[in-house]
Structures are given as structure tokens and as C-alpha cells.
């Protein structure tokens, strides 16, 4: 999906929510590409702290990115799918009017997902969060990877995998 399709979908979603008398907040960096009269354009952090639900427009990759980015705000995410894969992004564009109206009326169920904390130890260490699963790879080199998996500081699995 292109950026123009995402912008068109964002404008349409904002219009539908405003017609339902919802308060619509949008990141101020989207004002030029997604302007809709009646939307409040604010810094991202203010949008995230004030909103009840975060809307993402894209595919599952967009939701995975936003889930990690918005973790500290503990807000539900509704994904409007304009991508190829819509397992997590459960609202299709042609369902937007119906689903956004139901959202404003409070007629929805939350689907909780497992969020994993991931920490890579070593010289190039990294840490972050993942939604549902983590893929560990060494790249293209044929080599063994030795790793340990912990849950609540208890060793769950110790593995040596040849790639």
C-alpha cells in the first residue's frame, strides 16, 4: 500500500469518527498530508497520552511497529488493514464505517496479545519488545547459535541450533 492510500484512509477514518461526535487526535506531523477540519493536531506524545484507542493504518507490520513504540501508554490498538496481511489488523477499509461507529459506542471486545521482553546479550546487545513471537537468526553464515530463554528470571530452555 502506498502513502497516499494510507493518507486517504486516515482522512476517511477521521471524518467517520467526527460524524460520530468523537474527539479525533492526530500527530501534528500528519497535518499536511491528512488534514481534516475538526481534528486536533498535537505532538505524538500528547496524542498517545490523551487518546483512548490508537488507530493504525497499514498491515500487520504497522501494528507490530506501533505496539512496540506505544507500549508505555497501555492503549488498545485498532488496525485498519490496507496491507497484504491482516491477521492483527482486523478492520478492512470497507468495514471502517461500521467498526468505527461500534468503537465510539463502546461495542467492541479487546483481544489481548502476549508481549515479550527480549534482550540480546553480547557486544552488539539489544533489547526491546515483541508481539507473540521472536525469531533468532545469525544471518547467512553457517554457524551454531547458543542461547538461553528465561521467563520471570527462570531458565526455560537452553538451546544450540546449527544454522
Show which residues each predicted segment covers.
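ATP/NTP phosphate-donor binding region
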Residues: 1-53, 94-109, 120-128
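Short glycine-rich anion-binding loops that position phosphate/pyrophosphate groups of nucleotides
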Residues: 2-3, 60-62, 85
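Short glycine/serine/threonine-rich phosphate/pyrophosphate-binding segments
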Residues: 6-7, 61-67
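Short glycine-/acidic-enriched loop or helix-start segments at secondary-structure transitions
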Residues: 36, 65-68, 89, 146
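Redox-cofactor binding/interface segments in oxidoreductases and associated redox assembly factors
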Residues: 56
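Short, acidic/small-residue loops that bind anionic groups at enzyme active sites
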Residues: 73-91
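Catalytic core of DAGKc-family lipid kinases
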Residues: 85-159
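Conserved small/polar residues in nucleotide/adenosyl-binding loops
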Residues: 161-163
Amino acid at each position: 500500500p502506498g502513502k497516499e492510500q494510507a493518507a486517504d484512509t486516515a482522512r476517511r477514518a477521521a471524518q467517520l469518527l467526527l460524524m460520530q461526535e468523537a474527539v479525533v487526535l492526530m500527530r501534528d506531523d500528519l497535518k499536511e498530508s491528512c488534514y481534516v477540519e475538526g481534528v486536533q493536531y498535537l505532538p505524538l506524545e500528547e496524542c498517545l497520552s490523551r487518546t483512548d484507542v490508537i488507530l493504525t493504518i497499514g498491515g500487520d507490520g504497522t501494528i507490530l511497529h506501533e505496539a512496540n513504540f506505544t507500549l508505555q501508554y497501555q492503549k488498545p490498538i485498532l488496525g485498519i488493514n490496507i496491507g497484504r496481511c491482516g491477521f492483527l489488523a482486523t478492520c478492512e477499509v470497507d468495514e471502517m464505517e461500521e467498526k468505527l461507529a461500534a468503537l465510539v459506542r463502546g461495542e467492541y471486545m479487546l483481544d489481548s496479545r502476549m508481549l515479550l521482553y527480549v534482550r540480546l546479550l553480547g557486544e552488539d546487545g539489544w533489547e526491546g519488545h515483541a508481539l507473540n513471537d521472536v525469531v533468532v537468526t545469525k544471518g547467512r553464515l553457517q554457524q551454531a547459535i547458543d542461547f538461553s530463554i528465561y521467563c520471570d528470571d527462570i531458565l526455560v530452555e537452553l538451546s544450540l541450533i546449527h544454522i
